[in-house]
Amino acid sequence: MARVKRGVTTHARHKKVLEQSKGFRGRSSTNYRIALERLEKALRYAYRDRRNKKRDFRALWIQRINAAVREHGLTYSKFIFGLDKAGIEIDRKVLAAIAFDDAATFAEIVKKAQAALAA
């Protein structure tokens, strides 16, 4: 059986890691051992933050809706409860966009929520 030397696969693996770590600072982009550690850490951060991004955006939408609703004399909690009672099913992302871009339309939505709360 022929002897297998693994230089080709090692070189390919090193090249792959160094290409992925391109742009890292210092020896993190040129030294394989350091680059591998930094790349693994970067991938862990990326995985974690893809999940955190969803939480962060939801919190941002809620803050924007709350700020817009308080101008109309309601709290966020009561507004969402009013929307539910009124049967209006608009998600927070769209509500935040409407509040941010189109104040008149948002005011109408708030009026409907207030009417449902009063009833």
Curated annotation (Swiss-Prot):
The similarity comment for this entry is: Belongs to the bacterial ribosomal protein bL20 family.
Q: What is the protein's given name?
A: Large ribosomal subunit protein bL20
GO cellular component term of the entry, any: ribonucleoprotein complex
Asked if the record carries the keyword Signal, the reply is no
Would the keyword rRNA-binding turn up in this protein's UniProt record? Answer: yes
Name a biological process GO annotation.
Answer: ribosomal large subunit assembly
Q: Which NCBIfam families match?
A: rplT_bact (TIGR01032)
Which Pfam families does the UniProt entry name for this protein?
Answer: Ribosomal_L20
List the PANTHER family: 39S RIBOSOMAL PROTEIN L20
Q: Name one GO molecular function term.
A: rRNA binding
Tell me the name of the encoding gene: rplT
**What InterPro entries does the record point to?**
Ribosomal_bL20 (IPR005813), RIBOSOMAL_L20_CS (IPR049946), Ribosomal_protein_bL20_C (IPR035566)
Keyword annotations for this protein, in alphabetical order, are: Ribonucleoprotein, Ribosomal protein, RNA-binding, rRNA-binding
What does this protein's UniProt record list under function? Binds directly to 23S ribosomal RNA and is necessary for the in vitro assembly process of the 50S ribosomal subunit. It is not involved in the protein synthesizing functions of that subunit.
